[in-house]
């Protein structure tokens, strides 16, 4: 999918200078679990939203928020993105605002790095929220733009306790 990102053809948006930081090694998190079903694992990555753009979803976990604020790109979506030699600028749009971040495409586990923390903090993301990342532009030089929809989730306040923090104290859901 090649979308034109010529600045003269895009809607006017505030200019954001990306914060440049080195990409960390990608061995900090374990690889994602294997897909639950054999034929439907690509559904999220290939089902278009209203605009017909590819997207992926992420259920916000503790690892997305603490300590390094990194958003890992699902492997089933990575084939839609260019394979840059190193870090590439990416912009996240949500709620009429924009955040500059970096796409680390040269790592085995692709991720959004620098700038993701500002997005997560500014949008008050919590464990249990979900984000839908719609790829709205991909430049020839590798720049990416995502429109992000935030779906608030989480557990009701009456069930939030220390249970569920470890496998020794699971949260039990009874029908």
From Swiss-Prot:
Region (Disordered): 1-45
Residue range(s) of DNA binding per entry: 56-154
Alphabetically ordered keywords of this record: DNA-binding, Nucleus, Transcription, Transcription regulation
Claim: Transcription regulation is one of the keywords in the record: yes
Subcellular location: Nucleus
One Pfam family from the record: B3
GO CC list: nucleus
GO molecular function: DNA binding
InterPro entries, sorted: B3_DNA-bd, DNA-bd_pseudobarrel_sf, REM16-like
Protein name: B3 domain-containing protein Os06g0112300
Highest classification ranks of the organism: Eukaryota, Viridiplantae, Streptophyta, Embryophyta, Tracheophyta
């Amino acid at each position: 999918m090649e979308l034109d990102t010529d600045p003269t053809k895009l809607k006017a948006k505030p200019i954001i200078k990306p914060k440049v930081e080195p990409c960390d090694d990608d061995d900090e998190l374990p690889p994602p679990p294997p897909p639950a079903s054999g034929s439907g694992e690509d559904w999220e990555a290939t089902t278009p939203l209203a605009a017909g753009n590819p997207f992926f979803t992420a259920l916000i976990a503790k690892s997305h928020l603490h300590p390094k604020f990194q958003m890992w790109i699902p492997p089933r979506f990575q084939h839609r993105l260019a394979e840059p030699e190193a870090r590439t600028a990416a912009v996240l749009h949500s709620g009429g605002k924009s955040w500059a971040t970096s796409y680390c495409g040269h790592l085995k586990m692709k991720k959004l790095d620098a700038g993701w923390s500002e997005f997560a903090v500014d949008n008050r993301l919590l464990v249990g929220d979900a984000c839908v990342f719609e790829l709205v532009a991909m430049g020839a030089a590798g720049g990416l733009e995502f429109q992000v929809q935030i779906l608030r989730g989480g557990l009701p306040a009456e069930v939030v306790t220390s249970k569920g923090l470890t496998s020794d104290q699971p949260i039990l859901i009874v029908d």
